[in-house]
Structures are given as C-alpha cells and as structure tokens.
Amino acid sequence: MKIKFIISNIATLLLCTNCFPQENRNNETAEDKKVRQDKIIQEHVYDCADKINYNFWMKQYQDCLDAGIKKDSTIAYLWQQKAMPYYKVRKYSVGKEYLDKAVFYNEKRWLSYRGFMKCIFAKDYKGAIEDMDLYIKKYGNHYEMDHTCAFYIGLSYLQLNEFSKAEKTFETDINEQIKQRKEAHFLDWFYHGISLLEQQKFERAIASFDEALTVYTNFSEAQYYKSIAKAALGHSEDEIQFLFTEAIENRKKGYTITEDNAVYEIYPYQLRK
C-alpha cells in the first residue's frame, strides 16, 4: 500500500509538472509568446535543421524539428519545415501530413503555400484549386512563390484539361496585374497562350507568347509553342523551322522556365533538354 501511495504521488507530481508550462503559456502576452517561439525556431531550425543536409541525413534533420515541436507543437513553421524536404524528395504523402498541421496552426500563412505544393509538387490539381479558392475568399489574391493564387488556379485548370477555365483565369489575373503593377508576369502570358493553343485559338496564342517573349526574349518554351501555332496557321516552313530551331537551341542553353523550384519538378509544358 505504501509503495502504491508513493507511485501515485510521483505520477501526480509528473502530471502537475507538465501542466505548469501550459498554464504559464495561457497567461503570456502575444509579445512574450512571439519571443518564446522565435527562440525555439532559432534553436531548432536556424541553429540545427538548417545546418543538416536532409538529402543525406533526413532523420537528423527531422530530429532537430521534433525537439522544437516537443517544446511547442503549435508553431506552424516547424511543421512546414518538416514537410518541405519530403516534397523535395518526392515523398508527397509524408510531407502532406506535416503541411496540413502547419495550415491548421496558421492558415493565413500556409494555406496558399499548401496550394502551391499541391499544384507544382504533388500534382493534386483539384486540391490546389480548393486551397487557392479558399485563400482568395478569406484573405485575397495573395502572392505565393512570386505568383498569385489565381495563377496556380489557372495552371491547375490547364493540367485538368479545363482549357476555357484556364484561359479566363489567366486573363483575369493578367488584367489585375497590369492594373496594379503596370505589367503581368511572363509566365501568366505563356500559360495563357498555352490555354489558347489547346483550344486551337492560334492567332491569340501567338499574341500571348509574344507578350511573354517581350519580357523574356530567349524563352525557349514560348518560342517552341509559338512555332506550333504558326505551323497550324500555315506559316512558311522556313519561318517555322527557324523559330523551332531557335527554341531548341535556347533550351539547350538553359533559357527555360526560371522558377526556383524547377530544379525539383518539371513545370507544365516545360521542354526537356
């Protein structure tokens, strides 16, 4: 009986010990919380995980983050950092579990990022549209990885063969960018051109490819698909051959889609070397 009493007291003490930090957190100010969480991020991301090459030492990388999560599992950035390398090594289902946690704890910051990962990495185009649509409704047409949420919606429609929806989405996004920034991103013009090409609207497709080439003059994909549109319209063989050859040469020289994440994934309609 005495032993049971001692064990019971020890268990109660352990439970209470674990409760005190949570009570303290409930009383902390927003500023104190930020300071505490920033310290955890510094220790377990910048001073630990970031110093490890996850391509070789994934367990050690994840251990750094897990130690931080044990201190505070509500820090969304720790969950995002756990997810990110799994997407980059194409273990999308593993990464998704952690990225969902990041969205749960900070939807405004990570929902559009999840939509981006679904579109470019996991190829979950319907899921990408859902995430980006929800983000736009709640927070506006935010930029994620240099592009608007609408851009990824248009790209997802393109990959789902819903070309008319893709065309309209890119068109609206281009007009909004011109209104706000005086110009649109060359990839919006390029993919707008692709959506038109897929619908055999060849003259309009060429016009959009030309807009992309105005910004990025050696853009091999724009040249390549422009040559296809010209062939469909019956342009001269010499003109088509010149443009096609120039596109192939520029692709060999590396004048392709310039997105940072193109080192991990082939982008839609990107030419292979």
Each predicted region: which residue ranges?
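N-terminal leader/linker segments that initiate helical-solenoid repeat arrays
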Residues: 19-79, 97
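Terminal, low-structured helical/coil segments at or just beyond the last alpha-helical repeat
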Residues: 25-29, 232-273
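Structural motif corresponding to the intra-repeat A-B loop/turn of tetratricopeptide repeats
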Residues: 55, 89, 121-122, 160, ...
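TPR-repeat structural position
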Residues: 57-58, 92, 124-125, 163, ...
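Single-residue signature of alpha-solenoid repeat helices
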Residues: 61, 95, 128, 166, ...
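Residue-level recognition of tetratricopeptide repeat
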Residues: 74-75, 107-109, 142, 146, ...
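Alpha-helical adaptor scaffolds
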Residues: 116-121, 149-211
